[in-house]
Amino acid sequence: RGLGDVYKRQAYAQYFTGESFFNPLTDPTKTVFLANVTFSPACRNNWHIHHAKSGGGQLLLCMDGLGWYQEAGKSAQALHPGDVVTIPAGVKHWHGAQKDCWFSHIAIECPGEETSNEWLEPVTDAEYAALDADCAQNP
């Protein structure tokens, strides 16, 4: 199974605005889980938190297209191929594609003790639309 063997991410569709695709690259029951996640234009996941008693968190390796990453209380960060995002456990955040671009990243779940994911509210259309205005003013 390579990066091109993707399928519709139906199990998690309730946590996404728009259409996304999910391709596990490793066995989720093993020590480190990697998956290729592809977002259609304007698709994004809900705010969420990766919890862990110790360790945990997530790494995003940006592969193709243009995306967004935002932590609660901070400005959104534009993502480009080759960018790496380190997300510590306990940080509320979201990520997804820019308005007119597909976006793909490799998501790596960092090993930890008592890890879990908490899915929260969607990123609203108004919040998302404001990103383009911010990006246009601050390229």
Locations of the language-model features?
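Acidic/histidine-enriched, glycine/proline-rich intrinsically disordered or flexible terminal extensions
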Residues: 114-139
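A short glycine-rich, His/Asp/Glu-containing loop-to-beta-strand
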Residues: 8-49, 53-56
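Conserved hydrophobic/aromatic beta-strand scaffold that supports enzyme active sites
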Residues: 22-24, 34-38, 59, 76, ...
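Short, small-residue-biased leader/transition segments that mark boundaries at the very start
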Residues: 2-7
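Ligand-binding loop in jelly-roll beta-barrel domains
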Residues: 68, 89-117
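A short beta-strand-loop-beta hairpin characteristic of the jelly-roll/cupin
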Residues: 44, 54-81, 91
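Conserved metal-binding segment of the jelly-roll/cupin
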Residues: 39-42, 79-100
